[in-house]
């Protein structure tokens, strides 16, 4: 494999010395970019875009052509895994993802099994293709949804505001939910390991909906299964460590518990105080975040002020990857995203080195 020209992102995740704070943005390849919209139109649909190796590579690289980002992230969707389990993923216009065959009957759950990874070969082909296109420019991040977040979509049949169906199952038939979560954990472990084999140099587990759970339920139905995945991941590839990032939106309450599951870094949403988060986790993990995506709707001056506040909050030394606290908004101005990236690089140097 080609030598990595910029490994700042990987070094920061492992708390090794860096010259500046690296940055990438969740959903950096997305609808806020006109070039993404053009490629998406060419593909025909979102799923066709995910499954077309050439076009998935193209949209992954697009933000790097515009911004001086320190990592690329595979263009895909967290719901590829349940789709490979036969649940029939589709996207209704304006409604987001849906499943034709949601898991609402015991008989369906009994039949659920870890999918053959060959059904996800298009994802691994994209990883290999993107690595080739990057040519060592920056590292490539692979990713998956967490077992609980995937289960939310699988049981609800799509997105939800109150998660009544899955919470009813959780409190009345936890045995059924355990079966789904265990299957998901095995599937995600195999899926991320296959991404690493294909060339992913770091991986992130997105627990988008973990924050809707009670304290006890988060530990029992989400964190336990993320720990299971982390324990089963390949941590070395191409002669170097493959860092694992765990991002639980709304998970700021559980940082101490999350810091103990073996991940290299924790993602923070924008509601957390990053300085307090650093004190709470100590030296156990690096931190990633946590600029409010809505702050990109501010002025260039307000964006710079917010960047400075977060960098000051984290303080001196390595172990911080700058990111948004959630995905970039589709209405964000790409020029403001550029100001964000350049400001992080400019202002962070004072916190590193001599």
Swiss-Prot record:
It catalyses: uroporphyrinogen III + 4 H(+) = coproporphyrinogen III + 4 CO2. GO terms for biological process: protoporphyrinogen IX biosynthetic process from glutamate. Substrate binds at residues 27-31, 77, 153, 208, 326. GO terms for cellular component: cytosol. Pathway: Porphyrin-containing compound metabolism; protoporphyrin-IX biosynthesis; coproporphyrinogen-III from 5-aminolevulinate: step 4/4. It is found in: Cytoplasm. The record marks 77 as: Transition state stabilizer. GO terms for molecular function: uroporphyrinogen decarboxylase activity. Its EC number is 4.1.1.37. NCBIfam families: hemE (TIGR01464). Homodimer. Catalyzes the decarboxylation of four acetate groups of uroporphyrinogen-III to yield coproporphyrinogen-III. This is Uroporphyrinogen decarboxylase. The gene is hemE.
């Amino acid at each position: 494999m080609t030598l990595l020209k910029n490994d700042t992102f990987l070094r920061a995740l492992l708390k090794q010395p860096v010259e500046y704070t690296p940055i990438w943005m969740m959903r950096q390849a997305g609808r806020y970019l006109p070039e993404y919209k053009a490629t998406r139109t060419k593909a025909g649909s979102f799923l066709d875009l995910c499954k077309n190796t050439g076009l998935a590579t193209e949209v992954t690289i697009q933000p790097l052509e515009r911004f001086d980002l320190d990592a690329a992230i595979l263009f895909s969707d967290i719901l590829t895994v349940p789709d490979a389990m036969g649940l029939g993923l589709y996207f209704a216009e304006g409604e987001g993802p849906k499943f034709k065959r949601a898991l609402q009957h015991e008989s369906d759950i009994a039949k659920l099994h870890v999918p053959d990874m060959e059904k996800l070969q298009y994802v691994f082909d994209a990883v290999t293709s993107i690595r080739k296109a990057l040519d060592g420019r920056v590292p490539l991040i692979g990713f998956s949804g967490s077992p609980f977040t995937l289960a939310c979509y699988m049981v609800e049949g799509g997105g939800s505001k109150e998660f009544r169906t899955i919470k009813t199952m959780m409190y009345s038939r936890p045995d059924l939910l355990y079966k789904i979560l265990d299957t998901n954990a095995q599937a995600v472990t195999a899926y991320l390991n296959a991404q690493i084999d294909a060339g992913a140099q770091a991986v992130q587990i997105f627990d988008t909906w973990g924050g809707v759970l009670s304290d006890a339920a988060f530990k029992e139905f989400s964190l336990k299964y993320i720990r299971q995945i982390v324990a089963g991941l390949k941590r070395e590839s191409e002669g170097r460590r493959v860092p694992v990032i765990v991002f639980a939106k709304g998970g700021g309450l559980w940082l101490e518990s999350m810091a103990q599951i073996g991940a290299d870094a924790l993602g923070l949403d924008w509601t957390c105080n990053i300085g307090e988060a650093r004190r709470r986790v100590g030296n156990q993990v690096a931190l990633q975040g946590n600029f409010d995506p809505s702050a990109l709707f501010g002025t260039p001056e307000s964006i710079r002020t917010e960047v400075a506040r977060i960098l000051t909050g984290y303080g001196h030394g390595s172990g911080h990857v700058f990111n948004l606290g959630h995905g970039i908004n589709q209405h964000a101005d790409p020029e403001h995203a550029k100001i964000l990236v350049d400001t992080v690089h400019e202002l962070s140097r004072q916190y590193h080195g001599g």
